[in-house]
Swiss-Prot record:
Keywords: Lyase, Pyridoxal phosphate, Schiff base. The lineage of its organism: Archaea, Methanobacteriati, Methanobacteriota, Stenosarchaea group, Methanomicrobia. The active site is at residue 80. Its EC number is 4.3.3.6. Catalyzes the formation of pyridoxal 5'-phosphate from ribose 5-phosphate (RBP), glyceraldehyde 3-phosphate (G3P) and ammonia. The ammonia is provided by the PdxT subunit. Can also use ribulose 5-phosphate and dihydroxyacetone phosphate as substrates, resulting from enzyme-catalyzed isomerization of RBP and G3P, respectively. This is Pyridoxal 5'-phosphate synthase subunit PdxS. GO terms for biological process: amino acid metabolic process; pyridoxal phosphate biosynthetic process; pyridoxine biosynthetic process. GO terms for molecular function: pyridoxal 5'-phosphate synthase (glutamine hydrolysing) activity. It comes from Methanocorpusculum labreanum (strain ATCC 43576 / DSM 4855 / Z).
Length: 291
């Protein structure tokens, strides 16, 4: 990927700021998401809650299914690949996907190495639990970061933890003296140039979205108030009682995240929320994958 292409990919990700990206498993769901105001959709054969329930090995979705969703909507379409599976990424780039999510939700293909995202023209989004993980993914070529949270649970606690951790580590880096940055870069195993950017600007070099456990308009607004620049919503929409209404409410909540009166209105009469899973009671944490 050339320097110009990298700059373009970062600018493309900037265009999604303030938006909601929704997991969808069919063209019909994709249309619901688009009509609700989603800025992009994530094409999946199974949403994270179903992946978690089924267990086993979870892989990239069928390209034919992804193409069906691409043909159904005019907004960007994303799709997930396994961590380290660069051939799945090559396939998605070949079908002209708009974004690739190298995702811990799927079973990792490589337990040591992530994809060298700099070799691709298509932009990548990756999950991170802290500043070190985020900057390592950016060094590999990611142009968007999201909290890992704990997908498929409807429990926001992990996403909150990851966002607060990242924010506190950014504040610490900003407070460092110039000569202390080198030690911090060594400890985090990240390039000094990326840590220098964080020190000078007080933020990541790429956009930072929230993901993992967002189930209500209040959850989405919480993550925005904590500093997220947008929100991914997975199982929380289409595992709920009224997906269309909940989807629209989450989109409006992200736009009006500092307006409690509006949030109260948006939270009314949404039907039953997804049945959640307490993240502390789970034996396999997806967020542990890919450091």
């Amino acid at each position: 990927m050339t320097e110009n292409r990298s700059k373009l990919n970062k600018e493309l990700a900037q265009m999604l700021k303030g938006g909601v990206i929704m997991d969808v498993t069919s063209p019909e769901q994709a249309k619901i998401a688009e009509d609700a105001g989603a800025c992009a959709v994530m094409a999946l054969e199974r949403i994270p809650a179903d992946i978690r329930a089924a267990g086993g090995v979870s892989r990239m979705s069928d390209p034919k299914m992804i193409k069906g969703i691409q043909n159904a909507v005019s907004i960007p379409v994303m799709a997930k690949v396994r961590i380290g599976h660069f051939v799945e990424a090559q396939i998605l780039e070949a079908i002209e996907i708009d974004y690739i999510d190298e995702s811990e939700v799927l079973s990792p293909a490589d337990d040591l190495n992530h994809i060298d995202k700099n070799k691709f023209n298509v932009p990548f989004v990756c999950g991170a639990r802290d500043l070190g993980e985020a900057l390592r993914r950016v060094a590999e070529g990611a142009t968007m970061i999201r909290t890992k949270g704990e997908a498929g649970t409807g429990d926001i606690v992990q996403a909150v933890r990851h966002m607060r951790t990242m924010n506190s580590e950014i504040r610490r880096v900003v407070s460092l003296r110039q000569d202390e940055l080198y030690v911090a870069a060594k400890d985090m195993q990240v390039p000094i140039s990326l840590l220098q950017f964080v020190h000078d600007n007080g933020k990541l070099p790429v956009v930072n979205f929230a993901a993992g456990g967002v189930a209500t308009p209040a959850d989405a607004a919480l993550m925005m108030q904590l500093g997220a620049e947008g929100v991914f919503v997975g199982s929380g929409i289409f595992k709920s009682g009224n997906p269309a209404k909940r989807a629209a409410a989450v989109v409006k909540a992200v736009t009006n995240y500092n307006n409690p009166s509006m949030l109260a209105e948006l939270s009314e009469d949404l039907g039953e929320a997804m049945v959640g899973i307490n993240a502390d009671e789970i034996s396999i944490l997806m967020a542990e994958r890919g450091k």
